[in-house]
Regions:
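A short, conserved alpha-helix in the catalytic core of glycosyltransferases
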Residues: 1-3
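C-terminal, non-catalytic tails of nucleotide-sugar-dependent glycosyltransferases
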Residues: 5-68, 75-90, 95-111, 146-172
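Short, surface-exposed beta-strand/loop "edge" segments at domain boundaries and coil↔beta transitions
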Residues: 68-71, 90, 124-129
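Short, well-ordered secondary-structure micro-motifs within conserved domains or adaptor modules
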Residues: 105-141, 151, 155
Length: 172
């Protein structure tokens, strides 16, 4: 099974050995949508069998955001509350909505009552703190997650409920 391989190195679309722009765009769309759905990158064990950490209902509450921060963070959570002007949000949705079936108007600055709320100041984001964002499922699975509040790095984490959502993501 070679998904997207047909045009990846297509010499009629690009130089030999160079990934085509078409393939790069499709790969970016697919990756962002996988993260939106599952909350993490694709994971495999040493035998290349898929590993599926629990899917949690996560909302980011971001201070000092901007358009770039919204673009980087939005796929990594189910909802994001961010202090940026509405026209910036609308521009992001207009640009990104054609790339996903997820309704972005239901993901940005909506009051929902998320299971887990993660609050932080975007001005304090670093490569280290971004690595936590990419691993919330693993972090929560590796600890005895309970209702309550705690801090980790730059993040204030409020756990309202502990529920797993991965079974709702598979349609048979």
């Amino acid at each position: 099974h070679m998904t997207c391989r047909g045009s990846r190195f297509n010499p009629t679309l690009t130089e030999v050995g160079k990934e085509s722009d078409e393939w790069l765009k499709q790969n970016m769309r697919s990756t962002r949508n996988f993260i939106r759905k599952w909350g993490h990158f694709v994971k495999h064990d040493k035998f290349m069998l898929p590993e599926v950490p629990h899917k949690y209902d996560i909302e980011f509450k971001v201070e000092n955001g901007n358009a770039q921060i919204l673009n980087i963070l939005e796929p990594w959570c189910d909802r994001i509350t961010i202090d940026i002007p509405q026209d910036v949000i609308e521009s992001y949705i207009k640009l990104e909505q054609p790339n996903t079936k997820f309704d972005l108007t239901k993901r940005i600055n909506v009051d929902y009552g998320s299971d887990i709320e993660i609050s932080f100041d975007a001005n304090r984001l670093s490569n280290n703190s971004y690595s936590y964002i990419q691993k919330w499922s693993e972090i929560f699975d590796g600890n005895d997650l309970e209702v309550g509040e705690f801090e980790l790095d730059i993040f204030n984490i409020k756990v309202n409920r502990v529920r797993y959502h991965e079974k709702h993501l598979i349609n048979l």
